[in-house]
Curated annotation (Swiss-Prot):
Listed PROSITE patterns: ATPASE_ALPHA_BETA (PS00152)
Subunit architecture: F-type ATPases have 2 components, CF(1) - the catalytic core - and CF(0) - the membrane proton channel. CF(1) has five subunits: alpha(3), beta(3), gamma(1), delta(1), epsilon(1). CF(0) has four main subunits: a(1), b(1), b'(1) and c(9-12).
Name assigned to this protein: ATP synthase subunit beta, chloroplastic
Family note: Belongs to the ATPase alpha/beta chains family.
Organism: Angiopteris evecta
Length: 492
């Protein structure tokens, strides 16, 4: 941790170590330095000069490779338009550092830690380098406790661990960002501590929507910014790959400060971790590395590990991380989601089949997993209910081929009952979201874990066999389902 702003470092003695650009390939630059003056890997370089139109250029780069012959290869964190061979490059002598602490709350930053919300500069009294080692094994905390989200399907079938890493896996358009925004709404508001949101390579519109949503809900307090509870770090789709590759580390560095120095419990939301891998792949190819499986970078597992291992709980505080993971072509065996799976304590898998049925959130309870779903952690009642729900849904899945060919009438009495209950369970797993109120017209519902377990127990036991399955669709707790059934009966 250093208390000097980065600008001060650049303007003093280190400026003597200057080089010049020898080659530009898209976002990648080759820079020559004097013999014996090569910068270290991950050092931050600054290109200063003027483009042909006479405009000032100030581009920050990060050293990726040492090429020999006193040359290094660096990746730019902003557009390389206007850069020319021969331009002066200054070695800052340190990795990229970003502002940390309370000054970041309520503000939006880019990958360099510069505010981009037009609210003026940040007083960066304390900055921290984005490249660090993971906490030592002896510092890690091993307490196990559940993080209640208020979303039925998540809390029941794949509960989240406090201080754990959670992956939201899904293809294009199945609802990952809506789910992550609902989790921010339910958890960040109720959560006393601070949150950090890293927008990695996603749509600018979604970043804007999230910012407006947070201002409305007072998670960002515009009247008194210092009372805000969240810091936002954006490196959106239109940014060069260098920025998208490092913006996750910028967000993580801000979260680590709250954990290690302020000793707080922090929430870290990342949307989307796949874009971090994708940007790494672009940089790797531009740097001339041989691609690995499916065209990904050969260092995929190392890059993912160096990010994920820093997201952990220590004896000082915790970081609970919720990460959206895009699944290319709905293929969970693709190297990017498959590598992310290995780091997750809980996986929430979104299904296109459920989304097509109109069941939102489209979370598949059979594919979703959690290390927390053990009877000695969640209790016998929760465990038995979750297993009962999964068994019923699995049996329904097995019977679907028979139903498609022969029809429901050919099933045994017991199987017909299983199908009826499974269809009720499937619909009861849907839930109206607060963040989707403007689209659906239905008010959002937060359902406590106790109410969730009670509702599914009643369906499994057969108490609600007489109610129509439509009564269970898009409701909160089980009392709302029975009330909806009564309304449907009156209408019919």
């Amino acid at each position: 941790m250093k208390t000097n702003p980065l600008v001060f470092v650049v303007s003093t003695a280190v400026e003597k170590n200057a080089g010049y650009i020898t080659q530009i390939i898209g976002p990648v630059l080759d820079v020559a330095f004097s013999p014996g003056k090569l910068p270290n890997i991950y050092n931050s370089l600054i290109v200063k000069g003027q483009n042909p139109a006479g405009q000032e250029i100030n581009v920050t780069c990060e050293v990726q490779q040492l090429l020999g012959n006193d040359r290094v290869r660096a990746v730019a964190m902003s557009a390389t338009d206007g850069l020319m061979r021969g331009m002066k490059v200054i070695d800052t002598g340190a990795p990229l550092s970003v502002p940390v602490g309370e000054v970041t709350l309520g503000r939006i930053f880019n990958v360099l830690g510069e505010p981009v919300d037009n609210l003026g500069p940040v007083d960066a009294g304390t900055t921290s380098p984005i490249h660090k080692s993971a906490p030592a094994f002896t510092q890690l905390d091993t307490k196990l406790s559940i993080f209640e989200t208020g979303i039925k399907v998540v809390d029941l079938s794949a509960p989240y661990r406090r201080g754990g890493k959670i992956g939201l896996f899904g293809g294009a358009g199945v609802g990952k960002t809506v789910l992550i925004m609902e989790l921010i709404n339910n958890i960040a508001k109720a959560h006393g501590g601070v949150s950090v949101f890293g927008g990695v390579g996603e749509r600018t519109r979604e970043g804007n929507d999230l910012y407006m949503e947070m201002k409305e809900s007072k998670v960002i307090n515009q009247e008194n910014i210092s009372e805000s509870k969240v810091a936002l770090v954006y490196g959106q789709m239109n940014e060069p790959p260098g920025a998208r590759m490092r913006v996750g580390l910028t967000a993580l560095t801000m979260a680590e400060y709250f954990r290690d120095v302020n000793k707080q419990d922090v929430l870290l939301f990342i949307d989307n971790i796949f874009r971090f891998v994708q940007a790494g792949s672009e940089v790797s190819a531009s740097s001339g590395r041989m691609p690995s499986a499916v065209g990904y970078q050969p260092t995929l597992a190392t890059e993912m590990g160096s990010l994920q291992e820093r997201i952990t709980s220590t004896k000082e505080g915790s970081i609970t991380s919720i990460q959206a993971v895009y699944v290319p072509a709905d293929d969970l065996t693709d190297p990017a989601p498959a590598t992310t799976f290995a780091h997750s304590d809980a996986t929430t898998v979104l299904s296109r089949g459920l989304a097509a049925k109109g069941i939102y959130p489209a979370v598949d309870p059979l594919d979703s997993t959690s290390t927390m779903l053990q009877p000695w952690i969640v209790g016998e009642e929760h465990y038995e209910t979750a297993q009962g729900v999964k068994q019923t849904l699995q049996r329904y899945k097995e019977l679907q081929d028979i139903i498609a060919i022969l029809g429901l009438d050919e099933l045994s009495e017991e199987d017909r009952l299983t199908v009826a209950r499974a269809r009720k369970i499937e619909r009861f797993l849907s839930q109206p979201f607060f963040v989707a109120e403007v689209f659906t017209g239905s008010p959002g519902k937060y359902v406590s874990l106790i109410e969730t377990i009670k509702g599914f127990q009643m369906i499994l036991s057969g108490e609600l066999d007489s109610l129509p399955e439509q009564a269970f669709y898009l409701v909160g707790n089980i009392d709302e389902a029975t009330a909806k059934a009564a309304t449907l009966q009156v209408e019919s």
